[in-house]
């Protein structure tokens, strides 16, 4: 009997001890949870969303600025509002050609533009936007950039010039027209002394072909044509050209050219600001740039094809650039590339990398893909 009582007393004591431990354990856990619940909302409220101020190199009216805003919307949505990027138009903070410096210094947190606008800082930068591309289109350039070593070479270029930025190439452009003129250009000699606007390495191309080149940002081209400061100019595509007012000052547009047949956009972040972001946000930004790239190409196909028709309704006459001029462009490119490679080792390294990638990508593309002109003529141009 005593043994039973003793055991019962021991059991009760043990049970009491465990009960007290469980109570205090739960109480401690509850206190920690309460502390956590109070602490984390306070941190979240103190931090709030991260706000970045960006600027594009495009006027508000241009579809290019719309593409820039599309990218920021994707980032803002994908981060659930934790990162909010505001995209201002060209000139809101700095001129279009001043974007790289402004982002490097932190005056702006980032921007949307093209590498050709930085040609004056390092001519090899233009190989990513307005160079010969060795027959590649813009999608091939993006493929080379991501998988063929281009990304690493661009980072090397920025390090060489002290560019404090993180760069993402995004948005393949169509082949750009030869230009808008007062009358059709039928031979290379027609360019002699012509006051012409272009940018990037295409400056060298048109200069060697006889034109007097003036590099202007997109929003300044049509006013210069209207005032007679230019005799001809190129910008980019049916939508941009129409929105910027090209058909108001010219009714002649020459299609097809090798001066800018593979340009892409560039999205840049101030490196310090970008490196300060959580890794999750950095991953979102990279994926958003690629999502925006794909979406831009689809939107461009829809809008450009419509505005190509609208331009014709506006009275614009389109002419194919003569093959003799196209062949001359290729010959001139050979001379320019050889000359730049002699004096700029980085230019030579990037050019060689592009050329090697193009030699296999072009062969695959031409051998595997159809001549779509045959199908178009069959379905839509029956006599």
Task: Describe the residue ranges of each PLM region.
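A gly/proline- and charged-residue-enriched helix-loop-helix capping module
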Residues: 139-155
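N-terminal secretory/targeting leader peptides
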Residues: 2, 10-141, 159-383
């Amino acid at each position: 009997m005593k043994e039973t009582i003793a055991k019962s007393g021991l059991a009760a004591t043990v049970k009491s001890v465990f009960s007290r431990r469980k109570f205090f354990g739960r109480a401690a856990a509850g206190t920690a949870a309460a502390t956590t619940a109070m602490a984390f909302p306070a941190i979240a409220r103190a931090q709030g969303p991260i706000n970045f101020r960006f600027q594009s190199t495009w006027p508000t009216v241009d579809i290019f600025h719309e593409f820039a805003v599309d990218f920021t919307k994707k980032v803002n949505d994908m981060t659930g509002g934790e990162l909010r990027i505001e995209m201002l138009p060209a000139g809101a903070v700095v001129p279009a050609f001043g974007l790289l410096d402004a982002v490097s210094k932190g005056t702006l947190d980032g921007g949307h533009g093209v590498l050709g606008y930085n040609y004056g800082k390092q001519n090899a930068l233009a190989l990513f936007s307005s160079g010969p591309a060795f027959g590649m289109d813009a999608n091939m350039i993006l493929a080379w950039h991501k998988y063929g070593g281009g990304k690493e070479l661009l980072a090397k270029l920025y390090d060489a010039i002290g560019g404090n930025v993180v760069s993402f190439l995004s948005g393949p452009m169509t082949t750009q027209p030869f230009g808008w003129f007062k009358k059709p250009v039928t031979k290379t000699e027609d360019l002699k002394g012509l006051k012409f606007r272009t940018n990037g390495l295409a400056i060298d191309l048109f200069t060697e072909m006889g034109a007097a080149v003036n590099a202007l940002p997109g929003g300044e081209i049509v006013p210069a044509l209207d005032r007679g400061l230019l005799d001809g100019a190129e910008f980019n595509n049916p939508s941009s050209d129409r929105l910027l007012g090209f058909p108001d000052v010219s009714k002649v547009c020459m299609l097809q050219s090798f001066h800018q047949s593979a340009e892409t956009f560039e999205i840049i972040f101030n490196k310090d600001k970008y490196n300060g972001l959580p890794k999750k946000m950095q991953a979102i930004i990279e994926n958003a740039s690629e999502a925006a790239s794909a979406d831009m190409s689809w939107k461009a196909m829809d809008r450009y094809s419509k505005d190509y028709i609208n331009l014709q309704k506006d009275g614009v006459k389109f002419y194919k650039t003569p093959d003799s001029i196209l062949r001359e462009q290729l010959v001139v490119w050979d001379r320019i590339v050889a000359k730049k490679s002699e004096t700029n080792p980085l230019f030579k390294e990037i050019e060689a990398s592009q050329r090697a990638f193009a030699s296999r990508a072009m062969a695959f593309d031409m051998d595997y893909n159809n001549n779509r002109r045959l199908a178009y003529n069959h379905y839509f141009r029956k006599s």
